[in-house]
């Protein structure tokens, strides 16, 4: 009996958190309607689900959306760059659908304010983490696919990623944010950025946190399953901050 009560309490908390935000602007950005149950699921991060009675979370939709995204972008690149070798279009796709590319799209549609996060993630600014933004974006694509089918999901994806796809060749076949940040600093005649990293968790499931500093000031922070990816995320945040400040 108490187990059922806890479950209902979790569902009530889920509905209350979801209804506290107007999600219509997000749907307007996407250009499609998503039925309530799918939208709730797509926006429910595992931290919220775990803190409220082990509710369903968006990871299965993320898995599905990742597949739809990959195929949509791969086919578009195949058509748009007919003379590029497989190795180049493969790297273009990897850059476009990377965590950083997805997080950029998420920020453009203000996705962070719509994600249902647990208290721990809220305290650590989870709404601005590239990993959470990227995963939730893929979950939304999965939800659109489930409701509307592949063609509609593909059209939404290609519209959101149009600029990145059109400029994939011009930007180069990969994006190394540490190099990009250093080039920006060199252009401004600023000193080199410095990186530090720590890890937590068991050996088989370590989570790395990297911090990039410039002249003693923290410019970016990133997380990842290894030091390299964490530093890339931190460098990406630092690059955006530098561009925004025009320091």
Swiss-Prot record:
Q: Give the GO terms filed under biological process for this record.
A: mRNA processing; regulation of gene expression; rRNA processing; tRNA processing
Q: Which GO terms describe its molecular function?
A: double-stranded RNA binding; metal ion binding; ribonuclease III activity; rRNA binding
**Top-rank taxon:** Bacteria
UniProt key word rRNA-binding: yes
Its cellular-component GO annotations read: cytoplasm
Name the keywords, alphabetized: Cytoplasm, Endonuclease, Hydrolase, Magnesium, Metal-binding, mRNA processing, Nuclease, RNA-binding, rRNA processing, rRNA-binding, tRNA processing
List residues of the DRBM domain: 176-244
Q: Where does Mg(2+) bind?
A: 62, 135, 138
For whether the record's keyword set contains Transit peptide, the answer is: no
Question: What compartments host this protein?
Answer: Cytoplasm
Instruction: Give start and end of each RNase III domain.
Output: 21-149
Catalytic reactions on record: Endonucleolytic cleavage to 5'-phosphomonoester
Q: Which residues form the active site?
A: 66, 138
Cross-referenced Pfam families: dsrm, Ribonucleas_3_3
PROSITE patterns in the cross-refs: DS_RBD, RNASE_3_1, RNASE_3_2
E.C. numbers: 3.1.26.3
- Entry's transmembrane regions: none
Which cofactors are reported in the record for this sequence? Answer: Mg(2+)
Q: Which EC class is the enzyme in? A: hydrolase
Q: Give the quaternary structure.
A: Homodimer.
User: PANTHER family, per this entry?
Assistant: RIBONUCLEASE 3, RIBONUCLEASE III
Role summary:
Digests double-stranded RNA. Involved in the processing of primary rRNA transcript to yield the immediate precursors to the large and small rRNAs (23S and 16S). Processes some mRNAs, and tRNAs when they are encoded in the rRNA operon. Processes pre-crRNA and tracrRNA of type II CRISPR loci if present in the organism.
Q: Which family does it belong to?
A: Belongs to the ribonuclease III family.
**Protein name, entry field:** Ribonuclease 3
Gene name for this UniProt entry: rnc
């Amino acid at each position: 009996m108490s187990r059922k009560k806890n479950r209902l309490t979790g569902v009530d908390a889920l509905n209350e958190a979801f209804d506290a935000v107007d999600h219509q602007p997000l749907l307007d950005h996407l250009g499609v309607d998503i039925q309530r149950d799918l939208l709730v699921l797509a926006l429910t991060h595992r931290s919220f689900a775990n803190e409220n009675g082990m509710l369903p979370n968006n990871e299965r939709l993320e898995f599905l959306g990742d597949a739809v995204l990959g195929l949509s972008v791969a086919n578009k690149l195949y058509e748009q760059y007919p003379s590029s070798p497989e190795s180049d279009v493969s790297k273009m796709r990897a850059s476009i659908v990377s965590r950083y590319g997805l997080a950029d799209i998420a920020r453009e549609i203000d996705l962070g304010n719509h994600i249902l996060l647990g208290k721990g993630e809220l305290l650590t600014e989870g709404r601005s983490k590239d990993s959470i933004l990227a995963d939730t974006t893929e979950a939304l694509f999965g939800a659109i696919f489930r409701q509307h089918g592949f063609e509609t999901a593909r059209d939404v994806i290609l519209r959101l990623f149009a600029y990145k796809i059109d400029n994939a060749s011009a930007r180069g076949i990969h994006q190394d944010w540490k190099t990009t940040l250093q080039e920006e600093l060199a252009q401004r005649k600023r000193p080199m950025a410095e990186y530090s990293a720590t890890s937590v968790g068991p050996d088989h499931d370590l989570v790395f946190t990297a911090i990039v500093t410039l002249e003693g000031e923290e410019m970016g922070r990133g997380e990842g399953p290894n030091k390299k990816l964490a530093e890339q995320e931190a460098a990406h945040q630092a690059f955006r901050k530098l561009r925004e400040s025009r320091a």
